[in-house]
Amino acid sequence: LSTADEWSKQSAIDYYAQHRHEVSDLYPSEKVFLPRVLFPGIKVLDVGCASGGFFNIMRTYEPAIEYTGIDLSVKAVGMARERYPEAKFIVTEGFGLPFEDNTFDLVHCTSVFNNEPNYQAMLQEMYRVSSRFVLVDIRLLKNIGKQQNSIYNIQFEGGRVEATVPYVVNDADEVANFILGLKPKPKALRATGYFHQMAKEAEHADFEVCMTVLLVQKGDAGSGATVIDLGNLPIEFSVSGD
């Protein structure tokens, strides 16, 4: 189910035009892995790029990047192209990514999985087109079993509710086990994050979830056990990299 119309509402377009373009706009968890995985000449795919803010953030850390941003909103991509003509932006919908295997060194995706129930299909495609790293954020809880879905209001800056999309919280072990089952086997799975109240636009904004950033390092056919480093999360996992 496409949410292109919902994310093209004016309050969403205006919000991402004004926010999330500078390193100072990043959440603490977003500052941990991103500067460590960027290097001169890196080829980056940014999934859910909105108006292109992460291009500016990434080039602040590393000026020599080759950046491609994709988003389902025609309006957002139009703004990104106008603001950052030196980068590449594409409108695309659905779970299939229009790129060959191992095209990008880094596939980055933030503020998407918390509104997408089928994170598995997206993550599998991102892993496929990456040759080295996949960096994503996701909302997690321990021992909830099945995925929890509620409502997220497209209502930025205190205006009226223009539309609604899902707000998704996933089971921590289920997500980790899905990642560990990717082919080829990941070399490493690392994470950082903290408990925080849901976004104020969410239906249960007073409820705390683990705001999690996951860094998956892609393996190859000869990869052995996956290195698992989840110690920076306030959640205990019951998973094995064997």
Residue ranges, per PLM feature:
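Short conserved loop adjoining the S-adenosyl-L-methionine
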Residues: 96-101
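Class I SAM-dependent methyltransferase SAM/SAH-binding core
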Residues: 51-95
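Conserved class I S-adenosyl-L-methionine
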Residues: 1-38, 41-50, 135-160
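A short glycine-rich, Lys/Arg-flanked "PGG" loop and its adjoining helix->strand segment in the class I
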Residues: 120-133
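Short alpha-helix
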Residues: 164-191
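A conserved beta-strand element that flanks and buttresses the S-adenosyl-L-methionine
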Residues: 108
